[in-house]
Amino acid sequence: MHSIARILVVVLLMCCAASGSKAQSGNYDVFVPISKYITQGNADALSAWFSDNLDITVLSKGGNSSKVQAKQILHSFFSMHTPRSFEITYTAGRANMKYALGNLNAGGETYLVTIFVYCSDDKNQIQQFKIERVQ
């Protein structure tokens, strides 16, 4: 009887550890497609992740914009600054909000990109997107 209890405890601990590591590794999967679209300079695909209204700032210009306006702003930026690479350098977050910082090399310059994503059970939406020139 004592050995059955031990086995049960070990199995429960393994299940908890496995589910915890899965949750940890899955936390930032949302940034994989977002990163891909930034690297490609694909404002159309990236805008599919935008909330209906979001805060977008590109090179110190911007503010609260509709999804359509934000797409046009990024389209303009990507047409003048062709992306060469993008790498997420930092991620953080809570249960329903994820945050990422990344370095974008575009048009021969380096930019810091900040992304806030609201996460719910049925969808993930970018609520804030910012591109700043690195001095």
Please place each PLM-identified region on the residue numbering.
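A short gly/proline-enriched turn/hairpin at secondary-structure junctions
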Residues: 56-63
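Surface-exposed, charged secondary-structure patches
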Residues: 72-110
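Short, well-ordered alpha-helical segments enriched in acidic and aromatic residues
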Residues: 42-53
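Exposed acidic/polar residues on beta-strands and adjacent loops within beta-sheet cores, strongest
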Residues: 26-29, 44, 89-96, 134-135
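Stable alpha-helical elements in mature extracytoplasmic
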Residues: 30, 34, 42, 69-74
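Short, low-complexity N-terminal intrinsically disordered segments enriched in polar/charged residues
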Residues: 2-36, 48
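Solvent-exposed, acidic/flexible segments
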Residues: 27, 39, 63-67
